[in-house]
């Protein structure tokens, strides 16, 4: 009889826990938009070395 309240509380805790679908993000879960944006920005940086050198002298 003493185990019944403990069993009910455990059932309530298990039912309120998040589902299996909630998975933490890994380093490989990078959105594709950021990769495409980087691919677009790289040629622009290479085509304008003067602007780059004004901001950062190490890129010249």
UniProtKB/Swiss-Prot annotation:
Keywords: Cleavage on pair of basic residues, Disulfide bond, Secreted, Signal, Toxin. Contains 2 disulfide bonds that can be either 'C1-C3, C2-C4' or 'C1-C4, C2-C3', since these disulfide connectivities have been observed for conotoxins with cysteine framework V (for examples, see AC P0DQQ7 and AC P81755). GO terms for molecular function: toxin activity. InterPro entries: T-conotoxin (IPR031565). Residues 23-50 form a propeptide. It is found in: Secreted. One of its GO terms (cellular component) is extracellular region. Residues 1-22 form the signal peptide. This is Conotoxin VnMRCL-012. It comes from Conus ventricosus (Mediterranean cone). The lineage of its organism: Eukaryota, Metazoa, Spiralia, Lophotrochozoa, Mollusca.
């Amino acid at each position: 009889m003493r185990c019944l309240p403990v069993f009910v509380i455990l059932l309530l805790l298990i039912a309120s826990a998040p589902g299996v679908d909630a998975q933490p993000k890994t380093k490989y879960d990078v959105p594709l938009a950021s990769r495409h944006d980087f691919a677009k920005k790289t040629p622009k940086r290479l085509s304008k070395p003067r602007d780059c050198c004004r901001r950062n002298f190490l890129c010249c």
